[in-house]
From Swiss-Prot:
Originating organism: Idiomarina loihiensis (strain ATCC BAA-735 / DSM 15497 / L2-TR)
UniProt cross-references to PROSITE patterns, sorted A to Z: AA_TRNA_LIGASE_II (PS50862)
The family this protein is said to belong to: Belongs to the class-II aminoacyl-tRNA synthetase family.
The protein's name: Histidine--tRNA ligase
Domain of life: Bacteria
Compartment list: Cytoplasm
CDD domains from the UniProt entry: HisRS-like_core, HisRS_anticodon
């Protein structure tokens, strides 16, 4: 688990603001779900033999003996909320969410046991147009963040559920001949979830997989047509991609389209965004059959990538520091501060509290990171003036009337 400290928050706020703006530009609405859900929700959706359910979920019994889990991902919760509140049946919904998720896994660079995800979920649209839309939305985010040259889109199709099952059987039959040579995790997965072996990082297992059947050989005609329509739309929109037939995703609910955005900018190749189509999940969780497609983006890795590429320029926490010198100034400081906030709502103004000498207050003003100190004493109060002292430049201090002060401070609100 990790804290986000005050000096880190502005970078996150900058990232969140871009995400909110881009999601809104595609007509998506925010949904907020609880972080605590019934354990059965994730067992039914993610799959009981996945690593997440078997090893990584934070699960416990509440006081009523009900098994509950801190959400490890957002899609299942979003579907549950949509079913529960009647948002999905016979409707088109474009939803987004952002918030903390929890997985008990080994902490590493950009990965924590409490982490944050931004997710997009589209319901009620079966055509490849919807798949293209969510991928285009994610691509726009990379462009907005200035990271388009740091990420690569990898794309695959799992075909229909029947095609996936047929491929699963063929892959299992092939790998059974090499069972003794597989790594321990792959041996365990051979019976329960052989598709996950395609994700193995073991070099010997990867060598064995080179001769494995190809997933595309098992695509049904409709899935093949759907995938061709998707790639045609991406190509028409100028989105380049790499076909990766070993891309299967770690959650059981996917069918047809799956995709990942990967980067090598954080060291070894890592995934920073992943998603796909999950047409059966809504019905699986108690709703009516509803097509759906979406993605999730890991925000810790996104922020880290932006920082390492020098792409974050968060706004200052403080623009101006108001220094009242003397009792009369201290009495009037709250009134003056509120008037400034009324005139300049975007101004980040700290008003000194607790009195003290000019030297002491100036030290605190400098430490705050403010661009200017606003000094008021008895003379300034009497004449309705404010003395402005720049703290980050060699400019001379000046004493200004109210309107001149507002005009002076206005540019700071854009910094």
């Amino acid at each position: 688990m990790n804290d986000l400290l005050p000096e880190q928050s502005p970078a996150w706020q900058q990232v969140e603001a871009v995400i909110r703006r881009v999601a809104a530009s595609y007509g998506y609405s925010e949904i907020r779900m609880p972080v605590l859900e019934s354990t059965q929700l994730f067992k039914r959706s993610i799959g009981e033999v996945t690593d997440i359910v078997e090893k990584e979920m934070y699960t416990f019994d509440d006081r009523n003996g009900e098994s509950v889990t801190l959400r490890p991902e957002g899609t299942a919760s979003c579907v549950r909320a949509g079913n529960q509140h009647g948002l999905l049946y016979n409707q088109i919904q474009r939803l987004w969410y952002m918030g903390p998720m929890f997985r008990y896994e080994r902490p590493q660079k950009g990965r924590y046991r409490q982490f944050h995800q931004f997710g997009i979920e589209t319901f009620g649209l079966e055509s490849a147009d919807a798949d293209a839309e969510v991928i285009l939305l994610s691509a726009r985010l990379w462009r907005e963040f200035g990271l388009a040259d740091q990420v690569e889109l990898q794309l695959n199709s799992l075909g229909s559920n029947e095609a996936r099952a047929n491929y699963r059987d063929a892959l299992k039959a092939y790998l059974s001949d090499y069972e003794s040579e597989l790594d321990d995790d792959s041996k365990r997965r051979l019976e329960s979830n052989p598709l996950r072996i395609l994700d193995s990082k073991d070099e010997k297992t990867q060598k064995i997989l080179e001769g494995a059947p190809s997933l595309s050989e098992y695509w049904d005609a409709e899935s093949k047509e759907h995938f061709e329509q998707l790639t045609a739309r991406l190509e028409a929109a100028g989105i380049s991609y790499t076909l990766n037939e070993r891309l299967v995703r770690g959650l059981d609910y996917y069918n047809r389209t799956v995709f990942e955005w990967v980067t090598t900018a954080l060291g070894a190749q890592g995934t920073v965004c992943a998603g796909g189509r999950y047409d059966g999940l809504v019905e699986q969780l108690g709703g009516k059959a509803t097509p759906a497609v979406g993605f999730a983006m890991g925000m810790e890795r996104l922020v880290l990538l932006l920082q390492e590429q020098g792409k974050l320029t968060p706004r200052r926490v403080v623009d101006a520091y108001l220094m009242p010198l003397g009792e009369e100034a201290e009495l009037n400081a709250p009134r003056i501060a509120e008037q400034l906030r009324n005139e300049l709502p975007e101004l980040r103004l700290v008003s000194h509290c607790g009195g003290g000498s000019m030297k002491k207050q100036m030290k605190k003003a400098d430490k705050s990171g403010a661009q200017v100190a606003l000094i008021i004493g008895a003379d300034e109060i009497a004449q309705q003036l404010v003395t402005v002292k720049p703290l980050r430049t060699a400019e001379e201090q000046q004493t200004l009337g109210w309107q001149a002060l507002i005009e002076f401070l206005q540019p700071l609100t854009r910094g």
